[in-house]
């Protein structure tokens, strides 16, 4: 197993241009596919999850041209649904942002499609989405465990009508439904059961759909109306914002050990909810400055916070490790959906924080972290989870440094993360 030793870093300073958002990249690729006309996507993320989506689209007959650096993609839209005369099997790795939306999109046209992935993908639930699609007239069947991939879709189109979907597991289920229902045969009305997690990710979806000319009526995140008879039309060019979740590590670095760290590609005009991570750092005591397309973090003494993090669960992970450098106790609440991500992130985070000496209480849907008087070095297991690796890079600001096991797992969203992180310490 590959290991990366991070020696102690006493100061960070500099500017980081954040790579494109994973969430926006894969949504935009799918909408460009369904749209009328050619769409030019700029600042596309170059990572494993995006490659899985691109490979699947090519296999499905979608024509696109990718630039040499993989950051610009011109997609020739299908002016509607995906059809296939031959049975297709698509391997989607551990990319939830490809698996869930493609599962929904492939029900719209005609053909037989089998969706598979890595072993972890077979543990990530998809049942609520499948139930909703089947209720709208789809024919989706599980090949192994009910409620989980792999699965087979016999596509004949979506009828429309009323449907319910659970809101408390993953916003990706609702995102997938929202993106495909404008192309159903009749109006679709979606009712949300329970509290909707990660509402800002739904805002991203609706904003992108609007860019492609499609309307969703949002009744306070409890009910969504998607009128029939709509079509996606290319807006010409779509700029993919920097990934706000990826920005969180650099902003935390500035807050802990700045200097001054400036991240560009996200800011006041961002459509991503994870930019609110900077407000959490501010609540902990950091100095934050905002621009339309940048955020600056400067260090100040940090103290613990007690917050509901349901709206920004991915970025919330960074607060769990930033808490190692704060006085007092930090409690992150309403984060059950950490458990169904790339790994069970609640259990993994608790285990690894204890290795470095933190006092940790792991609840069903919360984590409580108290920093020790002295942090310990350790070999941090990353669980094939990019965010675990990036979160624990912050331990380089301890006097003892840290070793990251399997650092290349960051290729899922940020292949050159550790090089960019090291550059701030020069």
From Swiss-Prot:
Query: Its biological function?
Result: Catalyzes the transfer of the enolpyruvyl moiety of phosphoenolpyruvate (PEP) to the 5-hydroxyl of shikimate-3-phosphate (S3P) to produce enolpyruvyl shikimate-3-phosphate and inorganic phosphate.
Gene coding for it? aroA
Q: In which pathway does it act?
A: Metabolic intermediate biosynthesis; chorismate biosynthesis; chorismate from D-erythrose 4-phosphate and phosphoenolpyruvate: step 6/7
Q: Which NCBIfam families match?
A: aroA
Report the source organism.
Answer: Shewanella loihica (strain ATCC BAA-1088 / PV-4)
Q: Which GO terms describe its molecular function?
A: 3-phosphoshikimate 1-carboxyvinyltransferase activity
InterPro entries assigned to the protein according to its UniProt record, in alphabetical order:
Enolpyruvate_Tfrase_dom (IPR001986), Enolpyruvate_Tfrase_sf (IPR036968), EPSP_synthase (IPR006264), EPSP_synthase_CS (IPR023193), RNA3'P_cycl/enolpyr_Trfase_a/b (IPR013792)
Protein name, entry field: 3-phosphoshikimate 1-carboxyvinyltransferase
Per the similarity annotation, which family is this?
Answer: Belongs to the EPSP synthase family.
**Per its UniProt entry, what is the enzyme's top EC class, as one word?**
transferase
Entry's EC annotation:
2.5.1.19
Asked whether the UniProt record includes Cell membrane among its keywords, one would answer no
Check the record and name the PROSITE patterns matching this protein: EPSP_SYNTHASE_1, EPSP_SYNTHASE_2
Determine if Magnesium is one of this entry's keywords: no
Q: What is its main location?
A: cytoplasm
Tell me where in or outside the cell this protein is found.
Answer: Cytoplasm
User: What is the reaction catalyzed?
Assistant: 3-phosphoshikimate + phosphoenolpyruvate = 5-O-(1-carboxyvinyl)-3-phosphoshikimate + phosphate
Q: Which positions does UniProt annotate for 3-phosphoshikimate binding?
A: 22-23, 27, 170-172, 198, 314, 337, 341
* Subunit structure as annotated in this protein's UniProt entry: Monomer.
């Amino acid at each position: 197993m590959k290991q990366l030793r991070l020696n102690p870093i006493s100061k960070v300073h500099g500017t980081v241009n954040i790579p494109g958002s994973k969430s926006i990249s894969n949504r935009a690729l799918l909408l460009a596919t369904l749209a009328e006309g050619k769409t030019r996507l700029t600042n596309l993320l170059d990572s494993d999850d995006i490659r899985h989506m691109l490979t699947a689209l090519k296999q499905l007959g979608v024509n696109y041209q990718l630039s040499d650096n993989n950051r610009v993609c011109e997609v020739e839209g299908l002016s509607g649904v995906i059809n296939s005369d031959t049975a297709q099997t698509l391997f989607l790795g551990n990319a939830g942002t490809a698996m869930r939306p493609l599962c929904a999109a492939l029900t719209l046209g005609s053909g037989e499609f089998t969706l598979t992935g890595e072993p972890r993908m077979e543990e990530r639930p998809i049942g609520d989405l499948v139930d909703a699609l089947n209720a709208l007239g789809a024919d989706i069947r599980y090949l192994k465990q009910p409620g989980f991939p792999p699965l087979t879709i016999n596509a004949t189109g979506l009828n429309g009508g009323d449907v319910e979907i659970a809101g408390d597991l993953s916003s990706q289920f609702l995102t997938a439904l929202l993106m495909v229902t404008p192309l159903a045969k009749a109006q679709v009305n979606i009712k949300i059961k329970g509290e909707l997690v990660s509402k800002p990710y739904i805002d991203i979806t609706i904003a992108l759909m609007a860019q492609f000319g499609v309307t969703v009526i949002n009744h306070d995140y409890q009910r969504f109306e998607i009128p029939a008879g709509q079509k996606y039309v290319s807006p010409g060019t779509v700029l993919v914002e920097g990934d706000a979740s990826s920005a969180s590590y650099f902003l935390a670095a500035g807050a802990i050990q700045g200097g001054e760290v400036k991240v560009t590609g996200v800011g006041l005009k961002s459509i991503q909810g994870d930019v609110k991570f900077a407000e959490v750092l501010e609540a902990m005591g950091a100095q934050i400055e905002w621009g339309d397309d940048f955020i600056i973090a400067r260090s100040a003494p940090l103290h613990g916070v007690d917050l509901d993090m349901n709206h920004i669960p991915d970025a919330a992970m960074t607060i769990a490790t930033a808490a190692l450098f704060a006085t007092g106790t930090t409690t992150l609440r309403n984060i059950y959906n950490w458990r169904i991500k790339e790994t069970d992130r609640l259990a993994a985070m608790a285990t690894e924080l204890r290795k470095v000496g933190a006092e940790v209480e792991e609840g069903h849907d919360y984590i409580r972290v108290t920093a020790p008087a002295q942090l310990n070095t350790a070999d941090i297991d990353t669980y094939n989870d990019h965010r675990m690796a990036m979160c624990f890079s912050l331990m380089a600001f301890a006097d003892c440094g840290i070793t990251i096991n399997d650092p290349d797992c960051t290729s899922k969203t940020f292949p050159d993360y550790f090089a960019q992180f090291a550059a701030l310490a020069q």
